[in-house]
Structure formats: structure tokens, C-alpha cells
């Protein structure tokens, strides 16, 4: 339960058209539809010194929302490669929940090299999803003819099509909600604000009642915790 306040430590989103509100880490999103395009032939292109989405798109003269951004994490289950649209950000809480891991830390260059990729040029094409967990945001799976890393220094692919050119381990909503995104309840636009947490609900089951030896009668007058 949140109260909007400029001094709040948490960031929340709320819909301007309905009563939907959520912490940004928990806010759900539906995949954004992309304009239909005929699939083009995948090409590998040289992209020297282009390790960021902004640099790659400027060099290739492509809109950022036609690119795919990669973020790599290490976990107790091994390497996790996450892919979202170029103008989106990865929501780590959603990745943890999707993959069923306890925690994430940024992957090292050594771990990336062992998986057959390199920082700044990571992409889903050619990655063995039996050795590496590949998580692709649902919006990416609806895109066509996108640009992504070619998993080697100084190269990217263009005209990559999800499903045809790569198969992920998981397809899920893993992106961080942004101001102006469509509300998951009514389709209206969401806005952002700071908030203070004034209450929270936990599923504690019998954790405390068992410790306190508390019992209550059942409908049949049986004693149970």
C-alpha cells in the first residue's frame, strides 16, 4: 500500500484513466505490437567501436526501437542473457521471477566469452539455450527485421526476426514500465510518481502461529494451527 509523496523512496506508476497503480518493479505490461513487415534476409554488418544502442543505431541510421538491447547476468543457475527492445530497460525482479533464481549479479567478460559472446555485441542469434538461459521480452518477439549484436567484436546483425533466427529459453514480460506505457488494465497511459510504503501483505502461512503455539477451532470443532 503506497501513498504518493515527493520524498518517497519507491517509484510507482498509476493510470490516468482508471484506478490501476503499482510499484514499478511489479507493474505488468502487455507486449507492444509492431507494424507488420516482410521478413528480410539476415545480414552481418561491421559496427566498429559501437558498444551501445545509441552508437549502433546512429552508425547504421536505424531507429532505436528497431534494435534489441542485451543485458547479461550470472545466477546460481548459470548465465542469463536478457533481451529487450532498444529503448526499454530490463526489470531484474521480473527476470528473477521468470528464471526462478534467488539473485542476480552482472556477468563477467570471462563468463560471456565461455558462452560464445562478448560485451557490447551480445545477441540472441547462435546462442545455445541449452547451456545459457536466454530470456526475451514478449515485445521483442513481435518485432521484425531488428538489429542486434552478432556475438563478436565489431559486428551486429540486421534484419533479424524472432522465431526464424533464434529461439529463447523463456518469453516473458521482463521490461521496466515507462511513463506513457499503456495501462495493463484499461489501455490508458500510465504516469510515474514517488511513493512511501505504508503497508504490505505477506503470505506467512503458519510461520508465527506455529512459533506462538496458537490454535483455533475448525468448522468441525477440531483443533489445528
Question: Where on the chain are the PLM-derived regions?
Answer:
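Extended, low-hydrophobicity, polar/charged segments
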Residues: 2-216, 220
